[in-house]
Structure formats: C-alpha cells, structure tokens
C-alpha cells in the first residue's frame, strides 16, 4: 500500500510538471522608484482568460511562472496609476524578460479606469491582502472553503481549520460583522463562493486598541468575506437532502437575509452519519466559561480517537442562528444561538496494561452505552456608543445542558494471565446544568491622545443537578462487594468580579497603565448517597456531605509600554492576594488559606524587514484549584476508579515564556513560523494513584514541587514553481517532566509527543484539486520504577485527496487514508484502508446539484485508539460508522442577477 501511495505522489508530480515558461521584469514609476505590490496578470489573448498572476517584490521585480507557449496579454495594475497592457509572445522554453515597465499616474478615479475586474486576482493595501473572488474559477456549488483553498497564502486543512500567512485563523467575518463568533468553519462551510466578492486577510486589533488608538499588540489573524452587492440586500441560502443505504440520512439547510442594518443567518442539520454541524470547539463552548459547574460530576462527551473517527453511532440534529442588528447609529446588537440534540450509541472494548513497583496487571473492559444530550447556548452583545469618546457594552452568555446516559460495563483483571477479580456495573445518570455569565463594560477616552479609562463588572451564576443509580458488583481475590446505590450531586457557583484600568500617556509613544481587580467566588456542592438494597432507601450518612469552596482574590498592577512602528515593548508587575477556603459545615479543612504573589510580565514585539516578526513574551500567573480537585466527597460513579479531592491543595504558580519568529513572503506566498514555549510551575496539580484491594484505582490530586513543560512548533509552506505544486510542513514537539506518586512512592514522570506532517498539493485548481500527505505521531512516557514501560506509540497515516471536473457540470472526488497503529506491548500493529468517493452533476444553471456519495468503500473502518498514561498503556476498540452509499440533491436559494463587479482597495 505504501507503494500505491508513492505512485500517487509520482502521478501528482508528473501530471503537474510539464513544459514551463516564465516572464520577468520590473515595475517603476516615472521617477524610477520601484512600485511594491503591483499586480501582474497574464491573460489568454483569444478570450482574456486569466492564466497566471503575481505581485512585485521590494525591488519592484516580478516573475510569472507556469506559462505555456502562445500569444499572451500582460496586464499590470497599481492603485493610483494607469493600467499597463501589452502583448507578449511565448515561443520557447525559459525566461522571457519584458524589461522595465513604467506606470504613469492615473488621471481618473479608480472606478472610471477601463479594466476588467475579474482579471485582478489580488491587491495589497497597508496590512490588508484583498483577494478578488471573481478571478478564481470555481465549480458550481463550491463553498467558501473551496474558494480559500485556491487563494495563495491561505491553507485549509482536512478538518477545515484555516491558516493565513502561516497563522491560525480563529475568526471569519461577513461584511465586517461577526458570524457565529468563535467558529470560523460555520461561515466557510455554509456560505457559497458564489456569494463572495472579495476575501480580505488582515491582523485585527483588539476592541480596546481599536477604540483607544493605543496598540496593545493583541492582534488576531482574521478573514473578512465581502459579499457581492446583490447579496447585501435580500435572502439567499442552500438546501441539501441526502439518503442512502443502512438507513443513513443527512439533511442541511442554511439561509441568510441581509440588509444595510440587519444580518440574519440560520443553519440546520439532521443526520445519523456522525457529522457535526458545529465544530468540537462549539460543543465544548456550550459549557466553556462554566466549567466549574461541571466539576465533580460524571458527565461524558463524545471524543475523537486514534483514527480520527468519532466514538459510536450518533443521531443528531442541530440549529444555529446569528443576528447582527444596527438598531440606531449609536446602538448595535449581536447575538447567536446554537442548539444540538444527540443520541449516541457506543460499544467499546479495551485492554490496558498497568505497571506498578509491586506488580503489573492487565484489565479487560467492555461497555455498552447510550447517551442522549440536549445543548443550548445563547450569546448576546449590546454595544452603545453615544459619542466617539465613550462606549458601553453589555454581553451575556447563557447555556442549558441536559444529559441522560445509561451504561452497562464489565471488567476483568489479570496478573500474568491469572484471574484476580471480575466486576460488573450498570449505571444510569441524568444531569442538568444551566448558567449565565454577564459582563458590563464602560470605556472612555479623553481628549489627550492615549489617555483612557475602562471599568468592568462581571457576574456569573451556574447550577448543576445530577442523579445516578448504580448497580455494582466485584468478586475475586481479596475482594467481594456488592452495591446498589442512588447518588445525587448538586452544585452551585456564584461569582462576582470588578476591574479598573487607567492609561496615561507619558510621552508620545510611552504609556503608563494602572489596574485593579477584585473577585469573589463561592461553590457549594452537595453529594448524597442512598442504599437501594434496603426498602427504606436509606441515606449513607458516612458518605454524604456538603462542601464549600470560597475564593477571594484582589489584584493590583502597574505596567508601562512603548509603541513605535517597528517595536513594541511592555513590562509590568502585578500583586495578587488570595484567600482560598475549603470547608465542610463550619469546619475549615485546608491548613493554609492565605496566599500572596508577585506576578511580573514582559513582552517585546519587533517588526523586522519585510513581513518578518520576532515576538517574546514572559508572564507569571497563578491558578487556584478547581472544585473537583478539592472536594472531599468521593466520586465512585465508576467503582473501579475512586476519585478523591484534596482540600489542602495550593494554587499553581507558573512562569511562562514564549519566543516566536514569523516570516510571510507575500511576493512568492511562502511562510515560515518557529515558536517555542516554556512553562515552569511550582505546586502544579497532578493526579497521584494508589491501588487498593481488588486492584481498584484511587486517584488523589496533589501538588508537584516542580513541573516543566517545553513545546516547539515549526510551520513552513512554499510553492515549488517547476513542479506546479506547493508544500506545507508542520511539526510540534512537546516535553513534560514532573514528580508524581504511585502507591505513595515518589516517581519522576517524563512524557514526549512529536506530531509531524507533510502535505503536497497542486497550485492551479481550476479543473482538478489534488493533495497528498503523511502524518506521524510519536508518543512516549517513562517513569522511574519500571524501565519496561518506556515503549513509544507510533501512529502514522498517508492520505490522498482528489477532485476533478470531468465535463460540463460533472465532478468526481475521492479520499483515501492509510493508517497504522503500533506499540511493542500489543500483539500486532493495526492497519486501516479507508476510501470515500463522490460523483456530482449540476443542472438548472448550477442551481441544482445531484450527487452520489460513497463512504468506506472497502468496509474497513474501525474505531481504534492506543494511548499511554503515566503508568498505563491502553488499546481501545469502539463502534464507528461503516460502509454506506447516499444519493442526494442540493438546491441554491435566492440567486441574484449578475452585476459588474467594482474592485475596492482596502477594507471598510
């Protein structure tokens, strides 16, 4: 199979590598000054079809590659200058020089210049790169994600994540407005390329920097999708219906209605093929910011495992709406709502090998489970700006989660193939969580430039109620127990905080900031245990208890920063005073409750020549223990793993430093990023383990004296002109070292993880889009007491993706994966061959698309996970989706009539 993959790579390079011609020259103004960033386009003489393009570099030089013989039109444009057009005859192999081309200043407005907008693929103005969507030929029904794949300097991974200029894109705007903020893929997967006029890439400043005019160096790589004029007023969207073998189904709809003052969008999805309408980050964010409400419970979530397939078979439906409303020139509302229901069935088997100083043992676990979950999340933000000097904003985030789960599991424990014990566990759980987080912010800037004030108040309230019934039995050597229990777990969190920040300009580029913050938080869980084996449903008072964790924290800080065009420096010192109390009833449990810390910080951001940046950041921070780590109530929802809390935990004190170098060459669209992060923690909270009679695992959090974490990241992407392809390399190395305890014995744990990937793809994607790559994952864990445990996991995968337009309206696609999972402790390596295919045809002027989709044609898909803990190796198999074939149709709603496109430079 490796040879087949290598053959595919050869086909890729041979297919793309034909005779190649080049045109080069220089672009200057009448004074002979190089014009940097001028757009160069080569067109077919017969029909003005764009063949290739580029932009001039720092010296005004350009080189256009991948040209074939024939008569070509050379078109050069630059903002504020008249367009240059000339005819070039390409008749031999090699480079053709057009010499120095002088552009004259334009005497007309940009919109009056006689040019064809669809020929200008991109332009650069300031910090913004503008891509003209009309210049890139798209097949019918293409999404924005498909469009982004064609844009030089932008990379789209197989999971839909986006990099622009080598940096991760976390936010995608639509006409400058938030679109389901927090999930960039909702816009790129649900909006069609047909709707887009321009794609703009820029570094978005923080809201504070945009308002005050003082750069705080907190920038985020952002993409803005500018709609065509026809789609800025009216409704448009898409309906997609699919059904197939094995009773599979997948129905999607998205609809958008925009006007100058209102943007309304809705998306919906119903499917049973394990497809998420929202990203995993969205599902996590259903509870994000409210994590304390979940601590201590037994809620589980669907997770991604070793072969990239979700665990189990999931029937789900999801709905999302987004609203941007300009109520008045001074008042603006943004809101989005996400809702998801899932019904997940899982069949799971695992074999784990545990290594201890006394004896090693093997555990074989099986489980059947059904989990029904309903999630709701609502985010709103109301912004009022009465005048340019003041702004008020009120934001509120709310969530509701309902989870019903029933699990039937069994466990067998062996020592050297000798049976030690067997256990069974039937558990039924219902959990409900709800919460709200409100934030009120006032910002004011004064007449003196740079002087500003901000006040913030935050209120958070969450509630959680969980009820479980457990029927558990274990018998074997040293143990014989049965338990029929009902447990209730109720937790409340109340938190209030306030922040003050004042900035005073000391000189032109020097600013002094004073800040203060006060936080008060209380969490009060109650866990009750009842014995169901008695007729009276007797409460087990020796286990039941209430607990209170309270945290009061006061911070005061001072910082000074210096900003210039090329260099930004910031240094600060913060003092934190904490009062952390754990108590049962009126009895305080923790020996120490008062803590004080000095938290220094320093950062430097240096802009080097061209698009090169060098950043360094250091800061100290303190993290207080979570409720689940401190609560004394025993969590025995899984009686084979008893989870205890430690009320005497100290806060973590962390020194964190990071250094990064970024280089993006917008002239040849290559990028390079190198980053290294180092954490040194004192009192890092880690989980110690002890093995009780029956080899039941007891987990107790403790403070590690020292915890070291090092992470290095490298990303490089660049075109290979002669092969007409581009490549990208990603590599992440993580190393951790800390002290832990197993059965009360101190143990040094070292973990290392290396993830490396190489991807090759063709550059010109008009008719075909081909990509191939390899991913390697190496994980290793070592400890002091057992050298035999130091056995790494090596997983690697090869993949090939292809999409081809084979005729008018006809498209065919394929996706192939070759995956291996290896570890010396397991009997044999596992190999998977996964093959998907699609065939589609467009009708009715591309409004209707009919398609056939085949998943796992070789019927080899299996759920596999091989992982390692501090002293445990685990091999897991689980149910996942197998082979099916679907027939479907999609229909585009609200297609507007075509209009001439006007190119705009910059962003609004």
Locations of the language-model features?
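Signature of Gram-negative outer-membrane beta-barrel scaffolds
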Residues: 511-613, 785-790
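Outer-membrane beta-barrel translocator domains and adjoining extracellular loop/strand segments
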Residues: 212-213, 277-283, 346-363, 405-419, ...
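Membrane-proximal, glycine/serine-rich, low-complexity loop/turn segments characteristic
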Residues: 19, 32, 61, 82, ...
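Outer membrane beta-barrel strand-and-loop segments of large Gram-negative receptors
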Residues: 366, 495-497, 539-545, 644, ...
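Structural motif
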Residues: 24-35
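A short, solvent-exposed loop/turn motif at the edges and junctions
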Residues: 43-49, 71-87
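Short, acidic Ser/Thr/Gly-rich low-complexity loop/linker segments typical of extracellular
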Residues: 45-61
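Conserved C-terminal beta-signal and adjacent last beta-strands/turns
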Residues: 757-778, 790-908
């Amino acid at each position: 199979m490796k040879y087949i993959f290598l053959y595919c790579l050869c086909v890729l390079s041979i297919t793309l590598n034909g005779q190649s011609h080049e045109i080069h020259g220089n672009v200057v103004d009448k004074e002979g000054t190089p014009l940097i960033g001028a757009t160069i386009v080569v067109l077919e003489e017969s029909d003005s079809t764009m063949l290739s393009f580029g932009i001039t570099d720092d010296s005004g030089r350009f080189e256009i590659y991948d040209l074939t013989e024939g008569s070509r039109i050379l078109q050069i444009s630059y903002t504020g200058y008249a367009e240059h057009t000339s005819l070039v005859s390409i008749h031999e192999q090699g480079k053709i020089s057009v010499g120095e081309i002088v552009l004259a200043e334009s005497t007309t407005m940009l919109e009056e210049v006689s040019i064809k907008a669809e020929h200008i693929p991109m332009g650069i103005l300031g910090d913004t790169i503008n891509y003209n969507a009309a210049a890139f030929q798209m097949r019918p029904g293409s999404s924005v994600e498909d469009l982004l794949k064609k844009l030089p300097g932008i990379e789209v991974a197989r999971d839909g994540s986006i990099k622009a200029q080598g940096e991760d894109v976390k936010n995608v705007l639509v006409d400058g407005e938030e679109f389901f903020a927090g999930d960039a893929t909702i816009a790129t997967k649900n909006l069609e390329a047909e709707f887009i006029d321009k794609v703009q890439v820029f570094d978005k400043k923080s809201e504070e920097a945009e308002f005050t005019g003082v750069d705080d160096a907190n920038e985020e790589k952002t993409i803005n999708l500018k709609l065509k004029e026809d789609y800025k007023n009216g409704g448009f969207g898409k309906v997609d219906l699919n059904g197939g073998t094995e009773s599979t189904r997948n129905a999607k709809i998205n609809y958008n209605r925009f006007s100058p003052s209102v943007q309304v969008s809705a998306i919906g999805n119903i499917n049973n093929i394990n497809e998420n309408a929202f990203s995993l980050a969205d599902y996590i964010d259903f509870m994000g910011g409210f994590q304390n409400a979940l601590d201590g419970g037994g809620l589980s979530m669907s997770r991604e495992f070793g072969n990239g397939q979700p665990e189990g078979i999931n029937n789900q439906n999801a709905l999302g709406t987004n609203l941007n409303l300009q109520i008045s020139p001074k008042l603006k509302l943004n809101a989005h709502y996400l809702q998801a229901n899932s019904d997940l069935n899982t069949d799971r088997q695992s074999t784990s090998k545990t290594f201890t100083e006394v004896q090693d043992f093997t555990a074989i676990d099986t489980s059947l489970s059904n989990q029904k979950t309903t999630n709701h999340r609502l985010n709103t933000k109301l912004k009022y700006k009465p005048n340019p000097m003041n702004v008020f904003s009120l934001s509120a985030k709310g969530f509701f989660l309902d989870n019903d789960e029933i699990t039937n599991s069994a466990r067998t424990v062996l020592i050297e193939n000798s049976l030690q014990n067997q256990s069974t566990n039937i558990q039924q759980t219902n959990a409900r969580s709800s919460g709200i987080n409100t934030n009120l912010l006032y910002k004011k800037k004064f007449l003196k430039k740079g002087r500003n004030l901000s006040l913030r108040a935050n209120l958070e309230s969450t509630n959680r109620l969980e009820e479980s019934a457990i029927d558990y039995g274990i018998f074997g050597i040293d143990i014989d127990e049965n338990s029929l229990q009902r447990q209730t777990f109720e937790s409340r969190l109340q938190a209030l905080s306030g922040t003050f920040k004042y900035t005073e300009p000391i000189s032109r580029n020097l600013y002094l900031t004073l800040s203060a913050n006060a936080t008060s938080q209380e969490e009060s869980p109650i866990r009750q245990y009842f014995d169901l084996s008695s007729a009276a449903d007797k409460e087990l008072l020796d286990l039941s208890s209430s607990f209170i964790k309270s945290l009061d924290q006061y911070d005061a800080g001072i910082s000074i920063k210096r900003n210039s065009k090329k260099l930004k420096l910031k240094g600060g010192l913060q003092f934190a005073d904490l009062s952390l109390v754990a108590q049962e009833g009126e009895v305080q449990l923790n020996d120490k409750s008062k803590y004080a810390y000095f938290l220094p910080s320093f950062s430097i951001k240096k802009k080097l020549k061209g698009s090169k940046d060098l950043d360094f950041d250091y800061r100290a921070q303190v993290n207080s223990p979570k409720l689940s780590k401190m609560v004394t109530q025993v969590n025995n929802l899984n009686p084979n793993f008893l989870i205890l809390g430690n009320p005497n935990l100290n806060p973590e004190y962390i020194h964190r430093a990071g250094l990064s170098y970024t280089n993006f060459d917008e002239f040849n669209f290559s990028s390079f990023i190198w980053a290294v992060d180092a954490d040194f923690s004192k009192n890092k909270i880690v989980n110690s383990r002890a093995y009780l009679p029956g080899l039941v695992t007891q987990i107790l959090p403790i403070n590690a004296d020292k915890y070291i974490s090092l992470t290095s990241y490298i990303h490089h992407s660049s075109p290979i002109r002669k092969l007409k392809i581009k490549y990208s390399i990603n590599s992440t190395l993580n190393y951790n070292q800390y002290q832990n305890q197993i059965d009360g014995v101190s143990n040094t744990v070292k973990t290392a993880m290396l993830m490396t990937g190489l991807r090759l793809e063709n550059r010109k994607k008009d008719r075909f889009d081909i990509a191939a790559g390899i991913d390697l994952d190496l994980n290793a864990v070592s400890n002091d007491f057992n050298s035999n445990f130091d056995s790494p996991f090596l997983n690697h995968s090869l993949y090939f993706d292809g999409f081809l337009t084979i005729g008018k309206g006809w498209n065919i696609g394929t996706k192939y994966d070759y995956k291996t999972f290896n570890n010396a402790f397991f009997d044999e390596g596992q190999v998977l061959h996964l093959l998907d295919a699609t065939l589609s045809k467009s009708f009715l002027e591309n409004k209707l698309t009919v398609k056939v989709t085949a998943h796992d044609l070789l019927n080899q898909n299996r759920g596999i996970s091989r992982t390692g803990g501090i002293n445990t190796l685990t091999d897991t198999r689980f149910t996942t989706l197998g082979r099916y074939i679907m027939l479907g149709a999609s229909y585009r709603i609200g297609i507007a009539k075509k209009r001439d496109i006007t190119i705009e430079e910059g962003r609004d």
